[in-house]
Amino acid sequence: MLTIENTILIVVDAQGRLARVVAESEAAIERIGILVNGAKLLGIPTLLTAQAPEKIGHTIPEIASLLPEQADLPRMSFSIWRDQAVRQAVQTLSRKQMLLCGFEAHICLYQSAMDLLTQGFEVYLVTDAVSSRRLSDKSTALAELLACGGHLTTVEMALFTLMRDAQHPAFKPISALIK
């Protein structure tokens, strides 16, 4: 089960043109924003990654503006784990639970999740904050991740799991985000 002390939120490739062409893009972007804001309220570190940003673009303003102090971690590999800067950022934070959101579910998110699972991390893919250009690609990636030992969650499920109860100091502001 997700815990605040062990979780890192990683926003994978919510960037440039890609963010606008995936299925149900506006809903996914909105959910990513809620998740990023919730992670901030809970004190959960968040990493922004961008694959080939010089070609595809950087993290979209709707998300980047929520973390103005944070720059994209650019990479060429599909998997975030295969990039030394991302790997070092994750290792420096010394946490074992990876909460993943972004695009595309069947390429960069899938390969990242598989590599993280192989390295012994617990991987939670936030289903309402991920997408692909085709929903069939997304559903296949989710099924494969689940079969390989990953976990599926939603924005609301993850945030409320992290808080544990209504006495958490972030309960009211997170409840307001969700509504």
What are these model-derived regions, one by one?
Residues 1-8, 41-42, 54-179:
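Active-site-adjacent betaalpha module
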Residues 4-7, 22-48:
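A short alpha/beta connector and helix-capping loop motif
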Residues 14, 48-51, 127:
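A cross-domain feature marking catalytic cores of carbohydrate-active enzymes
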Residues 16-20:
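Short acidic, Gly/Ser-rich segments with clustered Asp/Glu that frequently serve as metal-coordination loops
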Residues 23-25, 50-51, 75-78:
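Short, flexible loop segments at the rims of nucleotide/cofactor-binding pockets, characterized by
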